[in-house]
A protein has these predicted regions:
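Conserved active-site segments centered on acidic
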Residues: 1-67
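Glycine/proline-rich loop-helix segments at beta-alpha junctions forming the active-site rim
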Residues: 63-81
Length: 81
């Protein structure tokens, strides 16, 4: 199943959700994340937290949800306030 996590800036929550899902979802789940107004950078504390948890941060980037339109996720989850 393909999951797309969305938040405004794709800098913290959606990035963490993507990384954790991909780390623990096995072959059943594929996750990506995006933002409606991406900041262009992942928050350094998000990277630090994930690395401390032993979760791979390679390839994580802040990007627009437009970048995932062709990917066609099965579920879109918003993680905004």
């Amino acid at each position: 199943m393909k999951l797309l996590f969305i938040c405004t800036h794709n800098r913290c929550r959606s990035i963490i959700a993507e990384a954790v899902t991909n780390a623990f979802g096995g072959s059943l789940l594929q996750a990506r994340s995006a933002g409606s107004q991406p900041s262009g950078e992942v928050h350094p504390l998000s990277i630090k937290y994930l690395q401390q948890a032993g979760i791979d941060t390679a390839g994580l980037q802040s990007q627009s949800w437009d970048a995932h339109e062709a990917w066609q996720p099965n579920v879109v989850i918003t993680v905004c306030d």
